[in-house]
Amino acid sequence: MQPINSEYWSKLIDKFKIFSIYTIALFYISAGVTHFKNYDFFEAIVPPVLVFKSEIVYVSGVIEIVLGLLLCFKKTRHKAAWGIVLLLIIVFPANLYLYFSDVPQEALGISINQAFNRLPFQIPLLIIAYWHSIEKSSKKFSILCTFLFILTVIYFLSI
């Protein structure tokens, strides 16, 4: 039996990366729509020091939808992926607020452990967004990102 050649694995990883791009795009579009369908959830995690809570929830929802759509097109993928990186960094304080304050935990009916689980989840999302921003990456990095993508999908489906 012959071992599978390196070119085969490269093509397989490239196809999986495309699959991950469209899947993540769908997740961001879906999350953006959820800002409108489940407004109360997102409003509850906006830190109280921020004003214009409604606008923050709706604008961030629109941004997620737009970035998800732009991720689908090769011409706009690089900018969309970096937009996702920026968005993840900007909204991270909401996850911190959810963890450190019992107010949003009680409003959403989640435990401190569930709130804590959201914090490290941002790291794979950032790495995957970076992976999607570059056309070619090393085989090892692509394998890492493939693994992180699978864990991300499992996490998304479990919440």
Residue ranges and their predicted role:
Residues 2-159:
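Membrane-interface extramembranous regions
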